[in-house]
């Protein structure tokens, strides 16, 4: 047993924890779930954004870890998730001439509930300094029960840039890419402020709705 494993065992006695990915005892992430968070960057297309680079597929252990991080205050998952997002950022920057990162902001309700913005927190952990220029212009309904067209209509006009982005070549950053409605709205707000949208990097994409167009990590 390694020293790190021994220390984790001792910590589990005084502060019981379970794996954010599967619920196994005594580890924040068990040895079976850690490999699931190894980024395998894929690219996708969004009509309003262009290329979207995604680190992970939003399914299985990945989905459970992201939900635990966002909804159950499992901030111990922040480092591995930030590491995965950083690889998507690297791929995006290698393909696009980017001058600024702009994070898609949490909803006001989400920010009040958590006390922090999960995407900003991931970027900070990854050593990035995003521009905090997008804000809610109005409240949007929850997207979960809406069809694709309804999601786009629900998000339209919900974001605004708080200052000029003239001359900025922007890479948008978000957590999960599903229909593209949120990213498209963020792109609209950036363009309205004078910025150019060069694409987006996301932590995960929803594979049931999108088929990858190419793999960027050497796998076929």
Regions found by a protein language model. Give the residues of each.
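Glycine-rich phosphate/pyrophosphate-handling loop used in enzymes and phosphotransfer proteins
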Residues: 1-220
């Amino acid at each position: 047993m390694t020293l790190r494993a021994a220390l984790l065992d001792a910590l589990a006695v005084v502060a019981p924890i379970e794996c954010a990915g599967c619920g196994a005892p005594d580890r924040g992430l068990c040895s079976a779930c850690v490999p699931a968070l190894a980024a395998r960057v894929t690219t996708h297309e969004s009509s309003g954004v262009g290329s979207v680079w995604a680190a992970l597929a939003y399914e299985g252990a990945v989905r459970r870890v992201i939900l635990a991080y966002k909804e159950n205050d499992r901030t111990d998952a922040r480092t591995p998730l930030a590491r995965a997002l950083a690889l998507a950022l690297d791929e995006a920057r290698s393909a696009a001439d980017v001058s600024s990162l702009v994070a898609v902001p949490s909803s006001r309700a989400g920010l009040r509930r958590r006390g922090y913005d999960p995407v900003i927190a991931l970027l900070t952990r990854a050593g990035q300094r995003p521009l905090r220029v997008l804000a809610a212009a109005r409240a949007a309904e929850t997207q979960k029960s809406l069809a694709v067209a309804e999601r786009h209509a629900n998000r339209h006009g919900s974001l605004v840039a708080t200052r000029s982005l003239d001359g900025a070549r922007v890479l948008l950053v978000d957590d999960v890419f599903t229909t593209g409605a949120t990213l498209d709205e963020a792109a609209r707000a950036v363009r309205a402020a004078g910025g150019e949208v060069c694409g987006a990097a996301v932590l995960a994409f929803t594979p049931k709705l999108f088929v990858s167009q190419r793999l960027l990590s050497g796998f076929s």
